[in-house]
């Protein structure tokens, strides 16, 4: 995408670039199936490439830019092409986030509904950053649950730190949860959070505590980039 202020080195992808990237995604899915994986997830959040297509950074004027459905066409294309190559039994998940990274919240909901109606995905995974966060008095969680999922399972992520919170999410209609921070801080998080009195470690944490949980030095160094996570 072009249009990012202050980065003259950024150029808009050509249509040939997009075809090449789509082929790479599809080939990765094909290899995953050959290696015994049950499915793949297309990551359309956190500022990654597919997220940039959905965001306001996308200033394209061709079929991959303009309205939100055009911006998201690359994701629809990928779902269809992976389904064709890998078959009906191969699981395809898409991760989206309704905010941050230059995303327009209402646009994301419109695209998500379009994707669900399309009927080709097996899971929609919402990265909410904080499942309890409210906007104008309404939780983001309740907003994503207003969509019609057409029977598609839904999962959420975002500061899920206890068995009690997981139980509440299930009661709200969530089918499964995605654990990030909790699993980084506790390698056995699902088992640990069932113990009476369990609480997730407060941030920041020491690098040694992360090594104890089995994280590599490379990953710990990566986590140092997250403000307030690793105590130096």
Outline where the language-model segments fall.
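Flavin-dependent oxidoreductase catalytic cores
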Residues: 1-232
